[in-house]
Amino acid sequence: DQFLVEVKEEFAQSFEVKDKYLSGWLKHHNETKGKWIRARLALATGGLLGLSYQTVTKWAIVCELIHSASLLHDDICDQDTMRRGKTAVWKEFGVPAAICSGDYLIAESFRKLTEIEQGWHQNILLKLLSNSVKAIVFGQSLDVSYEHLTINKGQYRDIAIEKTSPLISMPMMGMFRCKELSDLECDALEEISKEFGYAYQCLNDMENLYGKEQEAYTDLTKGHPNIIVINVLNEQSEDINSQIKKHPSKLIKLIEKKHYLNWITEIRNTLNEAEKIMHRLPIIIRPILESLKNEMLMRIKII
């Protein structure tokens, strides 16, 4: 907990800039407090693997900076007007403000890596950071390119994995690579992260439909892929689907409790599949991923 406090303090310093406009945008964005999941993953993994305090804390900050930047850009792409109960930056200050804020945080994350004293750790983490950012961009490009009323489950899964899994695997993978764990162990973490990323995105979709900390049904009204919507459409006749394409709001009446229950089962099954891979990880690391799994199961209970 003490390390997390220090990470939060140093993270906040990255939001302190001299430009009064950028400073205001970043301040507004940083007021939407998150759960610090990525920092916790990096700190727990690095600590258990015995890596240096400096490498671990700097990497935890980097992961949170990238996540924060991704939220700014995601809100623009998805046209989400609220972020954790507050007005999104693009809605409050305009799209250019949100783009500039996100770009700044990405640049700051790369700068933060230069503060790591062990040069070979710098090189390892620089490569991973670059590849992770690219993967997130690839996922977002898929997300905005598919037509939300014609996308299939396989395409949805590809989007979910590309968009979400890098931000789950990156905090831990950085520590794995710095500790020089085997490719088999790194591959196992990658596979688990993909399953977790898919489950995480499905959960987000379900929460969108009932409006948790956001306006309900925005995936439908703004044309974003949503796993519940995909499965409801698969049950309908061509005639009804044709009507829905003309009037998407009609789909709301077709969403029933069974659709939520079916996907709660799907999410649980996905998490169980991920758990089957955990034996390939170092035993001291497994509780970290068990904790992440349990957190998603708690969100299911709320639904």
Question: Positions of the model-derived regions?
Answer:
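N-terminal amphipathic/basic leader segments beginning at the initiator methionine
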Residues: D1-A12
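Short amphipathic alpha-helical boundary/capping segments
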Residues: F11, H29, K276-R280
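Mg2+-dependent prenyl diphosphate-binding active-site environment of isoprenoid biosynthetic enzymes
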Residues: A12-E238
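Surface-exposed helix-capping loop/turn segments at secondary-structure junctions
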Residues: G119, M278-P287
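Mobile late-domain/C-terminal helix-loop "cap" segments
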Residues: Q243-M278
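Short, amphipathic C-terminal "tail helix"
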Residues: I283-I303
